[in-house]
Amino acid sequence: MERIHVAVRARPLTAEDAGSSPWRVSGNAIALSTQPSIRFEFDRIFGEECRTADVYGARTKHIVDSAVRGFNGTVFAYGQTNSGKTYTMRGSGNEPGIIPLAVHDLFRTIEEHLDREFLLRMSYMEIYNEEINDLLVPEHRKLQIHESIERGIYVAGLREEIVTCPEQVLEFMSFGESHRHIGETNMNVYSSRSHTIFRMVIESREKVDESEAGESCDAVRVSVLNLVDLAGSERAAKTGAEGVRLKEGSHINKSLMTLGTVIKKLSEGIEGQGGHVPYRDSKLTRILQPALGGNANTAIICNITLAQVHADETKSSLQFASRALRVTNCACVNEILTDAALLKRQRKEIEELRAKLRNSQSEHWEEEILNLRNTLLQSELEKERISLELEEEKKAKEQRDKRLIEQAKKIENLSSLVLNSERDDRTTVSSKNKRRLTWCPGLLSRQFDGQVLESVQEDPPSSTVRHGRNMEMPLHFEELIQESCESSIKHYTDAYSSGSLSCEDDSLPDSHALLHVTSRRKPNTMKKSDQEQLMGLASERIIPQELNDWKYTTQSQENIKACVNGLSARESEAILVIKQLEDQIKLLELEKSSFQNNLDDVLELATQQKASFHEKYEELQQNALVAQEQAKIANEKLSKQEAAYEFLTGIFVETESIAVQMDQSTRSVDNALSFIEELFQNLFMMAKNFTEAKQFVCGDITQFSSVIRDYENISNCLREKLSKLEMEKKILDEQSLDQKDELQRLKSSLESCEKAMEDCNIQNELEKDSILSELLTLQKEVVYLSSSSLMKEKESIRKELDRTKTKLKETENKLKNSIQEKIKLESEKAEAQREIKKLQSQRTLLERDLRKRDSFTVDKRHEQSVKSKELAGIYDQAVQIQEDYGKLEMHAFDMEAEIASLQEALVTTIAEKEEALSRVELLTSAVEDLESRLNSAESETSSLLEETAVLTRKLDASESISKKLEASISSLSREKEDMGIELTDVLLEMESERSTWTAKEKAYLEAKQKLNICNKNNCKLSEDLIKVRQELACCREQYSILEAKMIFSKNDTNEEKYCRETFEESERLLKKERNIDTGVNENELHQQLLSITEERDKLLSEIKYMNSVINESELIQAKATIDELSSRISIVEAKMKNDASAYNKENTKLRMQIRWMQPELDAHRGRLKEAINEMKLMDTKYLEASTKLKKDLSFYCREVLRLKEQLKESQVKAS
């Protein structure tokens, strides 16, 4: 069984499509970057820069080589329209496609096989709108699909051209391509509108010289190579198909949908369960039925485009290809063997065996074989002669029976004629009473006598010849005569005892009586020939005739008496009739006496013939007994030879099955299998020689001793080979240890990588905390600067911002380095996974080799034990071998357990690595958040700088106003020197107070805006809290699912504890979130603002009052109160900022913890799923191994019993 090989080839993209492509290819896997759960793995994935020759060398080259060896092969390209299928199959002038490469490679491999003759036939067809057209003969359209036992599924009327070179094939192909249906759509200028199937039929047989012509077996290998270019699936909305193009697209999509359903059902194993697979729903799947789950090597090339526009079509193509990976085929050599070819092959093998027997045995056995052949031939000739005699006797008996039936019919006809004539005579008896009455003329009597004479004179050739081939002895001649006499007497008595007849019927004479009457009329003129005829007639039928005559006379007398008593009117006429009848009775009595004399003579002749027949019968009986004994001897010899031939044929069948298995296994382990095949052939030949020697040389003790010596030599050779096998096993064990070391080294490297990742994470977290602290300090400083109006501090803030930018750039570089390290670790992980896969494949190969070698050694050891029982009784060694085999099995089970533990360790390391990668991703996301926050802080600082610039402008304006006021005050002071000074001071103080109040009002407005921003942030945080709670609810549900699964797994208690701890941590975090009462903070701030506004109103009223009164004491008190209020406002703002920063920190911490918890929960889910799958796999492997071991044990027990029986038979024959 071999699954379908699936390769994926991506079409090159433009620069625009390459930038927006959502697909990511890593090794032999492809996944969507937007949805990482959508991931596909295939046998090979070829990128955009690969060549068609690389695609051909991956699998198609092997399929072409196997087609030359007799295996069917199919390669087809699948994908959406405009994905490069036709380019892959046909190629271009610069780069040939799959079909030209396959054709050239096919002829090159044929030239390498010099020992065979080949005949190549090619055909080229298309399926257009569910109609099959012949591209080599365009007139042949609408061809039909048929199925037969000899040819399988084929297309009737399809032209097949015989080809001899690749150039001829490519010419026919280009001719067919010129007649293929091609159209133009919005997506492709040259779009294939039909499916094409390029088929090569390869017939081959062995080359035979004229001297070896009689020895060849005439076996012909016939294989079919299909290279299919499918039309692409398409959407009418994208292609813009209308009219004919729309109809073509619908037929293409329908056939591809049927292909998809067939692949799906085969991948699900519905055909093996007895379900229906719809091959007949489309002509494409009907033609490709042998390639889909049948007798062929199949490869699928899935062409895709990685552009964003075709993401859905690419996804569906990859899903089809992934389903095709699960479909398995059973490819085998297609060899046509006629009965003559089989006979030739068997004769050849028999002659080889005879030649070996001649080399190993003496001439005495050859003479005995020749004698046995002669006796067999003589017995066959005797059988043929006896069968011919029996056939001749059967024919003669059939002819005799036919003649007797004809004679009986003639006698009945004559009797009816005589009866009619008698009736006529009785009507005219009154007028013709003086005439002589005759019932039959002379000619009729003579004819009848001649016929009777012919029947009597026919003597059977040999009454003692046996009927059939049943070897039973015939009856004696006396018994046959007695049986005939008894049958005639019974017939007579039955006739006589039957009821009373009427007068008219009783008066009618019998046909035999008429014959006697005619003979009475002319007794003197009767010749000797007539007498001899009557004597011959009497030898067979005289007794029943006389009995009939006597019956007739008695009946006639009784009738006469009855008639005399009944006469009344015609007495005279009746008396005459009575007298005539009395005369007739007298004549009959005279004839009776003459017949009695004749009967005595006939009896004497019969006794003489009986004696002669008895002597002949005894001679034939003796000959038959001798022939029977010879036939028995020949049958015994034939049965022996047939048993030997059946045994040889059974061995031959077994060797063919084993050879097929060995051919299949040679692909993986060629060197080891070649050695095993040589050893198996040698042992098989030895076993054949031993069985034939045991059959032909049972009683010869000297040859038996030579066979024992040969067996000892064979056993020595086997021991040497067993020692070699044990050495190879040790080497394999060492290789497994090396692989274990490599696995440990990989584990250590993974651990070191994880440690490095953890260190990087710690450093990033520290840097993040430092950056956050610096940001907080900067925010505080910005707030402080907003209250002050010094330019130097602004410049220092800018410098610090530049420094933070440089630090952020450094952190970005570090993050980039960490990302690069992550990519390197991913590549190392992929390489490690590849190495692990390679190691696993090597392990499977080694296990397979070990199993085969173990089974082989077990078979050979059993054979040794049986032969030693037959020859010398080496039973202890077989027991030891079985114990060693058990130890080896235990060792194999230990190795499997170790491999399973290593696989589990690898799974855990991979999961841990994935966790580390998820943490790195989280760190990158955190850094991005920090960058966004820094950008927002920069924007805020820029806005603050703008505000400070506005404030400086206002200060400049206020200074100019103050200067003007000072000028006016100086002028007033001149006028009013006494009051001017005081007024100027008051005015200056009022102006300063107004400026401070305007600044405070602006600060109040800014605080209000910040409060609004805080409220918005609180709303956002509440929404985030709701989302977090929903995620926690999901986590709880997942945790409940995981907890239900954890009940079934006993060994995962640690993970369950870890999950519970994580759940408790999440609940604790929820409690913390619940404890954070945002509403309380908002209420406090609102109350503080209300108090501030009240104090502000009071101050405004006080200022108005001060303006009205203008007292110096009140102004001093107002200044004090203003200072106190400004300090309070600054404290409140600081508290609000601190609360907001603490709230943001706690929210970010909670989000980070939730994000960190999510991948851990996913990892735990994956671990549980993998553990469950591994348990299922282990159970299935254990069941399969136990069933195999049981079968092997039953088979070995049967062989032991059979060999014991053979030993007993050989001992009995020897004794």
Swiss-Prot record:
SMART domains: KISc (SM00129). CDD domains: KISc_CENP_E. Gene3D superfamilies: Kinesin motor domain. ATP binds at residues 79-86. Residues 333-414, 571-646, 708-855, 894-979 form a coiled coil. GO terms for cellular component: microtubule. GO terms for molecular function: ATP binding; microtubule binding; microtubule motor activity. This is Kinesin-like protein KIN-7I. It comes from Oryza sativa subsp. japonica. The lineage of its organism: Eukaryota, Viridiplantae, Streptophyta, Embryophyta, Tracheophyta.
